[in-house]
Structures are given as structure tokens and as C-alpha cells.
From Swiss-Prot:
Main location: membrane
Quaternary structure note: F-type ATPases have 2 components, F(1) - the catalytic core - and F(0) - the membrane proton channel. F(1) has five subunits: alpha(3), beta(3), gamma(1), delta(1), epsilon(1). F(0) has three main subunits: a(1), b(2) and c(10-14). The alpha and beta chains form an alternating ring which encloses part of the gamma chain. F(1) is attached to F(0) by a central stalk formed by the gamma and epsilon chains, while a peripheral stalk is formed by the delta and b chains.
HAMAP family: ATP_synth_b_bprime (MF_01398)
Recorded superkingdom: Bacteria
Transmembrane segments: 1-21
Membrane topology, from the record: Single-pass membrane protein
Gene transcribed to yield this protein: atpF
Name of protein: ATP synthase subunit b
Amino acid sequence: MHFLDESFWLAISFIIFVYLIYRPAKKAILKSLDMKVLEVQERVLKAEKLKDDAKLLFEQTEEQIKNLEALQLQMTKENNEITEKIVQEKTKEIEEFLEHKKVETIKLIESQKLLASKELQDEFSDEVVKLVSEYFHSTKNNNLSETDIAKNLMDKV
């Protein structure tokens, strides 16, 4: 190969041309690659931030769920206590009502007994008066002593 040969100079020119083109293009390519690297890094940082935010949100949600479960248990316990108290109060009221009705019923029975006893006494007294009247009318002898009258009356009964 000779230095004056055109293919040699063509090759040298091509190498110089490629070098001259590559040099500014190298800066543009490197700048573009650097921008892509920065963009990827930003995306990775955003993804990590989103991941951390999601993890924090998940932990907060779990904490809220635990709080709600504790609140639910507390409310259930309070409701059971209130229900038990109401049941006891109503049971006591019913027992007092039944006791009151029992006392009223006993008083009513006693008053009915007294009324029946009085009616029987009145009937008995009326019957005795009737028997004594009949006896006096039938004997027409009013000269008897009280003991004789009682004896005769008892014999008739």
C-alpha cells in the first residue's frame, strides 16, 4: 500500500470522518444515556416511595382493623352487660308484679271467705230465728223456762 494511493486516503478520510462524527455523537449518546439512567433512577425512587407508602398504608389499615375489632368486642361486651341488666330488671319487675297480684288474690280470697262466712252466719241466724219462731208458735206454751225451751229446740234440730 502506498501513501499516495487514493484508497489509503479514502480510508484515512473515512476514519477521520467517523471520528469527527463520533465525538459529538458520543457526547449526545452519553448525554442521552445519562438522561435515561436518571429517568430510570427517578422511576425506581418513585416505585420505592410508592412501595413504602403502600406498606405504611397497609400497616395503618391493619392497625385500624385491630382497633375496630377491639371496639367491636368492647361494644359486644357492653351490649351483653346492658342486656343482662335489662333482663334482671324486667325479671324483678315481673316478680314484684306477681307478688303484688298474689297478695291481692290472697286478700280477695280472704274477703270472699269473710263474706261467705258472714252470709252463712246470717243464713244460720235467720234459720235459728225461724226455728225459734216456729217453735214458739207450735208450743203455744210460753211458760217454759229457758233451759226447757233450749232443750226442746235442740231436740227438734
